[in-house]
Amino acid sequence: MQVTLSHDRAAVRVSPERWVVAGLAIALLAPVVAVAGVALGLRLDVSVLVAVVLGMAVVPSLARRLPREWDELRRTHAAWCAAWLVVAVLAALRSAGVAWFMADPQHAQSSAFWFDPFYVGHSCYSAYWQAAELARSGVENLYDTSHYAGFAGRFKIDEFFYLPQFLLLPAVGTALGGDFLSLRAAWFVLETALVGGAMVALCRWVGGAVGRRAALLLPAVWLASPVLVTLQLGNFQLAAIAMSVLAMVSFERGRPLLGGALLGFAVFKLFPGLLGIYLIATRQWRAVGWTLAFSALYTVAVYAWLGAAPFEAFVHYQAPRILSGEAWSFLWLDGLEPVVAINDSVPGLALKLDALGVGGMTPAIEKAVSWVWTLAVFALAIFAARRAAKMSRLELVSTWLALLALAAYRSPFVPDHNGLFAPIWLWLLVAAGTRLQPSRVVALAIAYLALSAVLPFGGMPLPELHGRMALSTFSQAIAIGLCLWVVLRRPLGEASGARASAMPSPAMSMG
């Protein structure tokens, strides 16, 4: 009886490691909850108090649910635990700062790039909000650039480039009421929850020691600028990637309805459509059917609600501008070389070479490169699909992320904060499945720094144009190289996960 009671007490005991992980996880989550309260109309101080109370109530339950394999890590891998603690605290602090700026834009000093006037005054969400307002008011051509010349508070209104169907999400927000700032906060909460939830869901689906290691690496990815800067800006790129990956996991789990609902909307960002090629090549006809069905449903819903004007404006005005390159022609103007320098687009390499004085670089060359790259990523999707049956879960999700990143690089303009998100997430998966030897630790550290390199425009000493080009292109090369390696490497299958779990390495032990 005594032995049984002692065993039961040991079974329910929560280790210090799990308490710390749970506490820091809630520290990352609580500021987002506080922003949600502000979006709903609560005062910031009240919202923060509610978030703190809720967080403290959740910590014990979360700590009990965390993997017991993490117990005693502070004794067996003290240095790794100390490094993890520093990164996790920094991630929580930086995330809290961004959340404060999202709740109250007057506190620019807490934003991700507080020193850069451009990032402090830029909001990608402003384009979605303005376009939704224009569509609901019945404007004939919501894509007319003259509609986006003003400001929303301190934020310069961005130009809207998306398909009309995308308006469904921001239009729901504007229909529910609230001003731009409250809807900006709500959009941040929605996208943060979606991205964070997708990251955790992938770790759980991969499972095993690799999944646990991936979960421990999440604070490092969350700390990276491609995540927090882009969440602050409100660009849909992150949500589109998260929705696409969740859709593919749903298809693998035999839930085509959910997967179709997610991917059917994500494809309105265009580049996730590459996964449709992958699904066709793997003969997942139910997944293809549900994706097409939901895309059609969203299209009908937007047409019925907002009318024909947005669609007609896109077909007759915006689509020709995109196809001809006119929509991005400003990138060829003199004086925009700093913008060209942060462009991670593959066709945008022509712009970089032109800015460096290389002759023969023209919009025609840029367009030719874009179509060659399009054919290349189509071929890579089919190549990956033909080997999908041999892949482990880790290899599958890594391949999906790599394909999404490569497809996104087809656009004429991919700012570094957008273009590096999928690769930094991919880095997490590669690191989680890698045996940690000194040379590999160095390589992973260099890759992490390169994939975190979002270059500011001002507010601090910056390298000259050639230096910016070199830094940006190095980061771009690491990102593209990582994605290509993941797609082209030979699949090891489920045995790879078992092999990684059996490796006598720090990474294995910390899993």
Segments (PLM) and residue ranges:
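Hydrophobic transmembrane alpha-helices
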Residues: V58, L62, A266-P272, W425
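Aromatic-enriched
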Residues: S15, V35-G41, L426-A507, G511
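Primarily membrane-embedded glycan-assembly and transfer machineries that use lipid-linked glycans
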Residues: V3, S15-L258, T282-D416, A500, ...
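Transmembrane-embedded, aromatic-rich helix segments that form part
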Residues: G260-L263, F271-T282, G289-A293, L420-A422
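Short amphipathic alpha-helix initiation/capping segments at coil-to-helix junctions
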Residues: E395-T399, V414-A422, A432, L436-A443
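A cytosolic-side transmembrane-helix exit/cap motif
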Residues: G259-G260, A309-H316, N418-A422, S439-A445, ...
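Active-site proximal loops enriched in glycine and acidic residues that flank catalytic Cys/His/Asp
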Residues: R410, P423-W425
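Active-/binding-site microenvironments in catalytic and ligand-binding cores
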Residues: A10
